[in-house]
Amino acid sequence: MTYVELHAHSAYSFLDGASQPEELAARAAELGYEALALTDHDGVYGSLEFAHAAKHLGVRPITGAEVTLADGSHVTLLVESARGYANLCRLLTAAHAHTRDTTSREPQPPRLDQALLEEQNEGLVCLSGCARDGLAVRDPNAAARLARAFGRDRFYVELQRPYERGDVRRNARLRDLAASLGVRTVATGDVHAHDRSRVGLQDVLVAVRCRTSLEGCERERRGNHESVLLRPEELLERFADCPEAVHETTQLAQRLEFDLTEELGYRYPDFSDGAEPASAQLRRVCEGAFAERYDDLNGHKRRVRRRLEEELALIDELGLAGFFLLHWEVLELAREVALEVRGPGSMRHVLPPGRGRGSSVGSLVCYLTGLSHVDPVENNLSLGRFLNRELASVPDIDLDFPRDIREKLIVRVVERYGQEHAALVASFSTYRSRGAIRDVGKALGLPYADLERLARRTDGWNAQRVAAEIAALPDAATKLRSPRWRAFGALCAEIAGLP
């Protein structure tokens, strides 16, 4: 193998990368890559999706991120070990900590203090950044400080050749910098699309990010179609004057052995103490509720007892007592918060602080611990969908909390478990038809009134049907004589599902 791409962006480099993680993985396999790094801007949102897809296709995934420093310059961080992944996540958390500045209504871009990166770099490899905004390009002295912090074996000067004005002069300066620091160079492609067919969409995404048209963001857009995943042989040709920077990518890739799909695991808190194991604590909670809810008046209690013993034995066998106790404890915290927020005299104090849903209602243990409001024995519900010996992962318990207690409950959970053991999980909006019509249409400079009429005609969901919706317009023949209207439908189909 002559080359490994160590700098690639997916659609999780929001409004910049134009390909889904699995598209990058598939293209890498097609081109014969042995490994590929995903380095999205200031996040690892697509890394697990990419890692699974790449491994399935025989490409070794490398985890990383392109991180923005406090001065606006970029460095590329690659993960070498599980410790490195932990440090990368901590650094990204710190970079995002002040993005919601209370003095501004607009979110601020992530920024990482270089001093923090110099302190928390164990298990990470640092490349000096991209051609436009790389740290070594913007501030060679700061790059030198970072090189000293990482050491010669974990800091590389990054060379890129996007075929823009100044390439030769910039790379000559960077090679001189590497020589003066005693570090090696690596070549990267700064990939923003898996294939040249997606370059037009990448231009549109930049326009959307800049809230303008394609003409209004010429300076921000890439000047050509070269920031795509290329054959390794093409990179060797591109860097014919410094082949060592190309070959160094394969040497470095061999060191980056961290596997996101295997090396991370989570174990729920054991809750055991010296006197009572977690399984005994869970039984105690269940027995207390059992005594309150069932009597000896009929045979139902015997059926419930058998079911309880079966579930507790299975939970003990799977080592999940801590899993159930954790959810129960969060629910108890919710009860405390609900009492504080609503007050004992409020009519709302009788409402449950939270309620489970989904397959967990089939569990008697969930019912007895308050995680579900449905008696599965009385309603003849099966446990198998929720919990069985063949489970590939932990079962799923969805707890819905009322809006009036949610904010205080989040604070209470963080206080209870600590900032290192509590996190908010984000979900991302993805493009559907109306959002695609409005954003892509604005980028192409299409008339606002026409876009609004078209948006109102659609079902609001499938952006891949926009071309068909255009063809159904009364003036479709006139519109489709315009190259921009013809491109519009295809671009909406390409942007469909992107975050």
Description of each model-found segment:
Residues M1-P499:
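Alpha-helical scaffold/interaction cores of sigma-54-like transcription cofactors
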